[in-house]
């Protein structure tokens, strides 16, 4: 039985991970839980899964959590604040830590888990996007496994099983196209928050659903794929695949192409990350290609999706620039969800912030450099949102 700590337990990734654990009680057990601010849901999870330790990032809500489970016996260790989440991530009894926290907030807990010798089921792409220059050397130093738990990188990882070293030629990341794949570019000026949250295929959290609508999610995945699989950016391509049945593909040196297929269900990559290298039987609905029907592909529209180009440019710049891109995107999407800026302001603001960082880009950033760049970018967004009157030039991927 594998012992698991789940960081980000009340979010979309967290609840689906717990669904898997509840289906396979003879395979997995929860020893640690950490969440952001949802006291009620975390208390319910503690009651059901009986972890040894739990934390809530919103420290002011710790007394409410303590009160909500005061009748439990035995009592888990309860902690509050970011430091509490980090303690949960490094807790001794866990073999694998699932990182399901959204955004750069997952970086420090992931590093703590790696330094404690835990294998990582990585569902938090920002850990590598912002912290790749720091995280990958730590993974090697501590001899832990870094297993992708999002659908696209899990698909690539699965396709690579049995491929000899040097056999990989190209990665093709598939994208649904998000909520606006069938909209004309001219209509994007009318986008509301409700429009952006209508993903055609996947059920996800609010932030990642907006990222899917801008295709920044796919741009961030390009950077993550670069760190995970070691390919140059010119060898990582994005293709629009509206059905979300093929989760990604790899091209080998002899031009053979391998793909991983399945219904759009995050539980499958999560289960594989938890069970690897084993394959566990499930009673989930198998893929029926006749039922799925046509599988279609098209090139992404760079005019409609400028965030894609910004991500490629940041990835190629390297250093601390991906951390700035990621932080700016997180902050701008939060402003959009609060209806403080328009949808089309998202790429404009991100580009302004990245442009301002060019002269300060740190080529070989330390963890402190990355955290400083992250904080700088978030503050810079507030300035950039005041300077959106003129349409900027979009950075080219070429």
Swiss-Prot record:
Give the required cofactors. Mg(2+); Mn(2+)
Keyword Nucleotidyltransferase in annotation: no
Binding-site residues for Mn(2+), renumbered to this chain: 150, 152, 221
Signal sequence range? none
What InterPro entries does the record point to? DXP_reductoisomerase, DXP_reductoisomerase_C, DXP_reductoisomerase_N, DXPR_C, DXPR_C_sf, NAD(P)-bd_dom_sf
The molecular function GO annotations come to: 1-deoxy-D-xylulose-5-phosphate reductoisomerase activity; manganese ion binding; NADPH binding
Question: Keywords in UniProt for this one?
Answer: Isoprene biosynthesis, Manganese, Metal-binding, NADP, Oxidoreductase
HAMAP family the record matches: DXP_reductoisom
The family assignment reads: Belongs to the DXR family.
Classification via PANTHER family: 1-DEOXY-D-XYLULOSE 5-PHOSPHATE REDUCTOISOMERASE (PTHR30525), 1-DEOXY-D-XYLULOSE 5-PHOSPHATE REDUCTOISOMERASE, CHLOROPLASTIC (PTHR30525:SF0)
Name used for this protein in its record: 1-deoxy-D-xylulose 5-phosphate reductoisomerase
Taxonomic placement: Bacteria, Bacillati, Cyanobacteriota, Cyanophyceae, Nostocales
